[in-house]
């Protein structure tokens, strides 16, 4: 018996629609990362991108537990001396609600060209509307 390896012709991608309203950020992100990698499919192959496209709506209504809404801090560096920037989860959700989910999911994907290809299949929107109705995304419950 040989190990199954998916070929590009074997991969059939779907578009999934996930509503982030009142979903815990980390639990949502881990489920989405698994779908983007394709680990929920029987034809999963580690060296290939077998995952589906994921559209997340209502990113502004995502929940966090405890007092992370005020206490969780996101850091990044500009590349210049003394250029470390910090923003709290509360301010990030107020200004760019989709970035919190994007950062959480990106941290759960591989750090390689394959991981970057998987990340491109993630579409996050702050509100109810999204421009992917032509792809007919199927509602997916988490």
UniProtKB/Swiss-Prot annotation:
GO BP terms in the entry: negative regulation of translation; translation
InterPro entries assigned to the protein according to its UniProt record, in alphabetical order: Ribosomal_uL13, Ribosomal_uL13_bac-type, Ribosomal_uL13_CS, Ribosomal_uL13_sf
Keyword Lyase in annotation: no
GO cellular component: cytosolic large ribosomal subunit
CDD domains: Ribosomal_L13
GO MF terms held by the record: mRNA binding; structural constituent of ribosome
Keywords on record: Ribonucleoprotein, Ribosomal protein
Pfam annotation, one family: Ribosomal_L13
PROSITE patterns with a match to the protein in the record: RIBOSOMAL_L13
Superkingdom: Bacteria
Keyword set includes Oxidoreductase: no
Family assignment from sequence similarity: Belongs to the universal ribosomal protein uL13 family.
Subunit description: Part of the 50S ribosomal subunit.
Function of the molecule: This protein is one of the early assembly proteins of the 50S ribosomal subunit, although it is not seen to bind rRNA by itself. It is important during the early stages of 50S assembly.
Protein name as catalogued: Large ribosomal subunit protein uL13
């Amino acid at each position: 018996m040989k190990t199954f390896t998916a070929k590009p012709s074997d991969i059939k991608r779907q578009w999934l629609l996930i509503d982030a309203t009142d979903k815990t950020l980390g639990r949502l992100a881990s489920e989405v990362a698994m779908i983007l990698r394709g680990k929920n499919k029987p034809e999963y192959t580690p060296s290939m991108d077998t995952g589906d496209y994921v559209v997340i709506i209502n990113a502004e209504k995502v929940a966090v537990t405890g007092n992370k809404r005020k206490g969780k801090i996101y850091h990044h560096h500009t590349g210049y001396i003394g250029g470390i920037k910090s923003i709290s989860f509360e301010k990030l959700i107020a200004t760019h609600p989709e970035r919190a989910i994007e950062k959480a999911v990106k941290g759960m994907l591989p750090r390689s060209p394959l991981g970057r290809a998987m990340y491109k299949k993630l579409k996050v929107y702050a509100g109810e509307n999204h421009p992917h109705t032509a792809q007919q995304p199927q509602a997916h419950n988490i």
